[in-house]
Regions:
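Class I S-adenosyl-L-methionine-dependent methyltransferase catalytic core
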Residues: 1-203
Length: 203
């Protein structure tokens, strides 16, 4: 596979951070399975829990070879790096916070993750410029009014067979998703997080 990286050894798990406290995320499957990555801890940052991420990628299947993925609110980058670990041909990670962007770039370098692109900017605006995506990750700040514009942007750029992953502080039912031409394919609750895998109504 183009851009294929080698699994990293134990000593390479440690990444020098720019500043602030840090914690770890663990990649669950694929090329970098069990790799632990240190990530910068920021106020309001809410990484997708390991259990939720594992369930999501069980839903998706273990092999994402050739998929084009886009994470509009990347945060720690856990979802995008997991997709790249499982063979995605591209995983675009967008984040507005400068410190998190710098950290995502360090992780990309550490993993030699050529399939990963890191961009700083407005995730929704950059999402609108995409075409024919296989998978869009939407995990916006829960206290921001971003769910409506994010869903509208996502549904306009995914393939007819594409998928949208949505994390939210409340469950979204099919009737809530009708204006976006989406429906719930799979869902789960983990603590205060509701995770949804959505498909187009025409799918």
């Amino acid at each position: 596979m183009k851009g294929e990286a080698q699994p990293i050894g134990r000593k390479k798990h440690e990444i020098r951070l720019i500043g602030g406290k840090n914690h770890e995320i663990r990649l669950i499957g694929g090329l970098w399975k069990r790799t632990k990555l240190k990530v910068l801890d920021k106020p309001g940052l809410r990484p997708t829990p390991d259990r939720v991420r594992e369930t999501l990628f069980n839903w998706l299947g273990h092999n994402l070879t050739g998929w084009k993925c886009f994470d509009a609110f990347a945060g720690t980058g856990a979802l995008g790096f997991e997709a790249a670990s499982r063979g995605a041909v591209s995983a675009t990670l967008v984040e507005q916070d400068a410190g998190l962007v710098a950290q995502l770039k360090l992780l990309k370098t550490q993993l030699n993750a050529e399939a990963v692109q890191v961009q700083r900017g407005d995730g929704i605006a950059l999402l609108k410029a995409q075409r024919d995506l296989d998978l869009v990750f939407l995990d916006p700040p829960f206290d921001a009014a971003l769910f409506d514009p994010a869903l509208r942007a996502a549904v306009s750029v995914v393939k007819p067979t594409g998928l949208v992953y949505l994390e939210a502080p409340k469950p979204w039912a099919d009737e809530d998703l009708l204006p976006y031409r989406l429906k719930v394919h799979r869902h789960l609750k983990a603590g205060v997080v509701y995770a949804h895998l959505l498909v187009l109504l025409s799918a």
